[in-house]
From Swiss-Prot:
Native species: Cutibacterium acnes (strain DSM 16379 / KPA171202)
Protein name, entry field: Uncharacterized transporter PPA2034
Phylogenetic placement of the source organism: Bacteria, Bacillati, Actinomycetota, Actinomycetes, Propionibacteriales
One GO MF term attached to the UniProt entry: monoatomic cation transmembrane transporter activity
InterPro entries in the cross-refs: AAE_transporter (IPR050144), RCK_C (IPR006037), RCK_C_sf (IPR036721), YidE_YbjL (IPR006512)
Topological category with respect to the lipid bilayer: Multi-pass membrane protein
Location of the RCK C-terminal domain: 178-257, 259-341
Length: 525
């Protein structure tokens, strides 16, 4: 055994990869309704790290790379919808601040009851909320061992309790009249419709505000592309595309559902999915691209990952998007030339924008701000890249630089970064977890961590319910409140809903700022 541990201690990269592989295997095993997913790397890291303290030494740079990759890519994904959702989420953000303050107060009170030191409480607060506030806590306590013990014991508690709470609420359905409908949940449908009245396309409910699109128009036996300026006459047939509720309203206005399926007739008009790989289109809205002038066609849908969206004029194209374009049959090649339609091209990572964006995030995170009473504040290697990613994700491009990554590339980098980070945390925390987990102090830390997290999380979830926001947005808000990447990953594996990442991004950045401040207050009280 000594020979093996000596070998692994001198080959840390091999050790990390073993933890990643075994953690991925553990993450696929179901424990009732719960599956650890990426968090399996954390628990395997704890097991392996407990074998020899040397496994967890000098992992700061590798761990930092993992957290930067994860947080920056999450920021890019959340940034595209964050600004539009800000008005809807300000209440959740306020609830998150209240929840963090209540957790700090409860931690101090329960800590004194169980005989824990302020250093213990500062460590467990940073650990159960899985935040970079541990750096601030260590500085405030001058590197006290109690701080690191509290962090090591409470970190896994934050993961387990967080996963359980997400499993409980992620698939719930409660009244959410103040939330927008999930694009993934609503889905899209296309209905061939017979026109029973004299009207026009612009008069159709939902057309002017981009809730429905029309493509095929059959008149007097001739098929052509419908345009916004077309008048519709009795006997015409049109294809209406949108989510089911909007399509039903449009069909009721126009006439009735046709027995004929217009999309089956592809002699004059045809349709195909094209991959967006043309750099000139990335970061631009659909409305700013002259699709009709260059192809005599029209885009009706945009598929991003597993999400199929109606082609609204304000949708910003990202590399790897798959647009469904209806064009005259002889102009399919023109549409392919316009969008690029190259899988190989979008599979390449734009190292310039990725490296520059992440570097800007690290610079932002390194800015130190001095506060009264000797307090210091910096975003750190997690919140800095996240905030920068959200900023760059919202502006999409700067001159020739395209900040967004293809959806598949973003997902791969995010998952890789997350598992590297969790594996390193597990390896570094293993010895302390093994030595203290079953002691009186260790059990007290675990109990206080679990109780305070449930209390703080309940405040955020209750706030979402009171504000009539969806359970899925509440799930993302809770994951961002905790700040645990594995919880976000688990939530996304349960529900395909873009509101989860939007809420996560909103609370993660703000929560990190508040945690860094409160953890220093805990030490001073």
């Amino acid at each position: 055994m000594t020979v093996l541990t000596d070998f692994l201690a001198t080959h840390q990269l091999l050790t990390i990869l073993i933890v990643l592989a075994s953690g991925a295997l553990l993450g696929q095993i179901k424990f009732g309704p719960l599956r650890f997913g990426a968090a399996g790397a954390l628990f395997m890291g704890l097991v392996v790290g407990a074998l020899d303290p040397r496994f967890g030494q000098n992992l700061g740079m590798i761990k930092g790379l993992g957290v930067v990759l994860f947080c920056y890519t999450v920021g890019l994904a959340a940034g595209s919808t964050f600004l539009s959702d800000l008005k809807r989420q300000w209440g959740l953000m306020l609830a998150g601040v209240v929840g963090l303050a209540v957790m700090a107060a409860a931690g101090l009170g329960l800590g004194r009851l169980f005989g824990l030191t302020p250093a213990h409480v500062a460590g467990l607060y940073a650990g159960v909320l899985t935040s970079p506030a541990i750096d601030a806590a260590s500085m405030a306590t001058h590197g006290a061992a109690d701080t690191l013990v509290g962090y090591a014991l409470s970190y896994p508690v934050g993961v387990v309790v967080g996963l359980i709470m997400v499993a409980i609420i992620a698939k719930r359905c409660w009244p959410a009249s103040k939330d927008n409908t999930s694009m993934a949940e609503a889905g899209l449908t296309a209905v061939s419709t017979v026109v029973d009245r004299e009207t026009s396309i612009r008069q159709t409910p939902g057309f002017n505000d981009d809730q429905v699109r029309m493509s095929y128009l059959l008149r007097d036996g001739e098929m052509r592309l419908a345009t916004p300026d077309d008048d519709l006459h009795v006997g015409d047939q049109v294809l209406v595309v949108g989510n089911p509720d909007d399509v039903n309203r449009a069909v009721e206005h126009l006439g009735h559902v046709s027995e004929r399926t217009l999309t089956n007739e592809r002699n004059e008009l045809d349709f195909r999915r094209f991959v967006v790989s043309n750099p000139a289109l990335v970061g631009r809205t659909l409305g700013s691209i002259d699709v009709r002038g260059r192809t005599s066609g029209k885009v009706t849908r945009v598929r991003r990952g597993d999400l199929d969206m109606l082609a609204r004029s304000d949708i910003v194209l990202q590399p790897g998007d798959r647009v469904l374009c209806v064009v005259p049959a002889h102009r399919l090649s023109d549409a392919a030339d316009l969008f690029g339609d190259s899988e190989a091209r979008v599979s390449q990572v734009d190292a310039l924008s990725l490296g520059l964006g992440a570097a800007l995030g690290l610079l932002l995170g390194a800015l130190m701000v001095a506060l009264p009473r000797g307090l210091q504040f910096e975003l750190g290697t997690a919140a800095g890249p996240l905030v920068m990613g959200m900023i760059l994700g919202s502006i999409h491009r700067t001159g020739p630089l395209r900040w967004q990554l293809p959806h598949a590339t973003n997902a791969i980098l995010r998952q890789l970064g997350l598992m590297i980070f969790l594996a390193c945390v597990g390896l570094a925390s293993g010895p302390a977890f093994l030595s203290q987990a079953v002691s009186g102090t260790g059990l007290a830390v675990i109990a206080v961590s679990a109780v305070t997290l449930v209390l703080g999380g309940a405040i955020v979830i209750a706030a979402a319910w009171c504000m009539k926001l969806s359970a899925q947005r509440a799930t993302g808000a809770f994951a961002g409140f905790v700040g645990q990447p594995a919880i976000l990953s688990y939530a996304n594996s349960l529900v395909n809903d873009e509101r989860i990442e939007s809420a996560y991004g909103a609370l993660f950045a703000l929560g990190t700022v508040v945690k860094i401040l409160l953890v220093q207050v805990i030490v001073l009280v």
